[in-house]
């Protein structure tokens, strides 16, 4: 029976590839169903002989507890956007300045969810979302239900590939029809539907929604020499690869392709929002390298956004964490790119003056980058009032006089004690990419302010459980949970703290680069502007901003208070070079941890030289198991893998 099961799996996977990926079915649906039922019956009788690539794995039926974080071995970078032909020409000039004979591979930009698939010995062992590019979510079980993703490859390869998971238009219409019949809210657009589906805890729902993929990148080291060859290799491995792409020798040919696809866009069976242009030669890609945020060898041209008319009702002015006062328009509701829009950014006071926006104007609204609603221009022929918009002279939060610096487009509150700035700064400090203090969100920050318990980020670490119990709706359990999260954040690597301080122009990636260079925040604070500006991919703007921040007495007092409170100021990655107790080991975390958050545990393991994986396999060296560990612990025991508890990790 084992041989017959293997034969059926091979046949069914081949037929599925012909149907879902190649679009060339060689057998009828009834014949496929007959073979599928035969396999299912055999697997029910002989469960120990079920093969890892059996198509029955795609049916669903498993309820997941949640999604673990998944650290990407190979980071996923976002792409620089272009919105005009001029921006594409500028990109081409930058590339050709170093490589005059370059050619470009142009691919459709699928409007879905970025995914990463990892295969070991040809078997799919992990599938994850992009997340922040460094850490995503492990959605392996859900991706196994996407019918055009191979569970096994033709060859026993160790390979990581990247692509886009999307919901075809026909599937989107069918899903929304069903939701309408069931009285459920409809998805706004196929991208939201795909993202929502992949985060379902019930894998059976994923299986029913007919998601699809296009793969386009081999993230792990490759033996081929061009992006075109990468696509051919992926297709040869039975991945679904979009056949609509061209190799262009000039930016003029790229633009012709863009114009052609723009005309055909609405007739495609899936949503796209642009064209991705990549240098074809992989060796040239490597030479060009990256900025902090994006590759220098690629750019994403975004199609012009949909535009709608709406009437301006009023304007709200809000203060951000850097003191910038931003105007937001309240509008008559309009449907825009699949969602109802009733608020849109007006950017800044200079923008209002430039566009001559007045009270009760009819305006054109669009979604900047297909995400953020913004006012584009006024429809002057429909103007009903000559009355100018009222621009505030004082801060809407602290009532300090606002300033408008000559070199800035926005109004700014420069009061360092402005409550709105401090609150926004605290929210940023506690956010996931900064200190990751679970439970310290906007509502709790508001309560802390109302009780006068916190005035700056150092005040977070002076909070006691008794303080937290003073907050409205806080019981002992919630107070203990937040207090534990605050204490755990003290052990974060210092790049999180640096990002959390909210220094202008210093993002999370720049923070990591800076701490890799200077090892701790005190040394960074003493570095000269020239030393910082000399770091590849940073430059003078970041150097000036850091110098301005650290020369302020208040900043030095804040750092001293944080250090006194026990907050770590060191870059933990340097410990790996010193003691690397787990150097080269593949470690898996499972279960609930009590002393550390999962991200902190991963950072500690990585600082000790470990590669942290989201799944257990024969290549796993060690499993750290917390409370209520489930299938991963069982699999580790079955494979004879060393198992340790959280106390062991804490002792390292």
From Swiss-Prot:
Q: Which residues are in the BRCT domain? A: 577-652
Known catalytic reactions: NAD(+) + (deoxyribonucleotide)n-3'-hydroxyl + 5'-phospho-(deoxyribonucleotide)m = (deoxyribonucleotide)n+m + AMP + beta-nicotinamide D-nucleotide
- State its cofactor: Mg(2+); Mn(2+)
**Which biological processes are named by the entry's GO terms?**
DNA repair; DNA replication
Question: Main EC class of this protein?
Answer: ligase
Binding of Zn(2+): at which residues? 395, 398, 413, 418
GO MF term set: DNA ligase (NAD+) activity; metal ion binding
The organism's superkingdom is given as Bacteria
Give the record's keywords alphabetically: DNA damage, DNA repair, DNA replication, Ligase, Magnesium, Manganese, Metal-binding, NAD, Zinc
Q: Which residues cross the membrane?
A: none
Q: Check the record and name the InterPro entries matching this protein.
A: BRCT_dom (IPR001357), BRCT_dom_sf (IPR036420), DisA/LigA_HHH (IPR041663), DNA_ligase (IPR001679), DNA_ligase_AS (IPR018239), DNA_ligase_CS (IPR033136), DNAligase_adenylation (IPR013839), DNAligase_N (IPR013840)
One family from Pfam that matches here is: HHH_2
**CDD domains, from UniProt?**
BRCT_DNA_ligase_like (cd17748), LIGANc (cd00114)
What EC number(s) has UniProt assigned to this enzyme? 6.5.1.2
Entry annotation: catalytic residues: 109 (n6-amp-lysine intermediate)
| Single GO cellular component term | cytosol
What does the entry list as the binding residues for NAD(+)?
Answer: 29-33, 78-79, 107, 130, 164, 278, 302
The UniProt entry, under HAMAP family, shows: DNA_ligase_A
Q: What does this protein do?
A: DNA ligase that catalyzes the formation of phosphodiester linkages between 5'-phosphoryl and 3'-hydroxyl groups in double-stranded DNA using NAD as a coenzyme and as the energy source for the reaction. It is essential for DNA replication and repair of damaged DNA.
Q: What's this protein's family per the entry?
A: Belongs to the NAD-dependent DNA ligase family. LigA subfamily.
Protein name, per record: DNA ligase
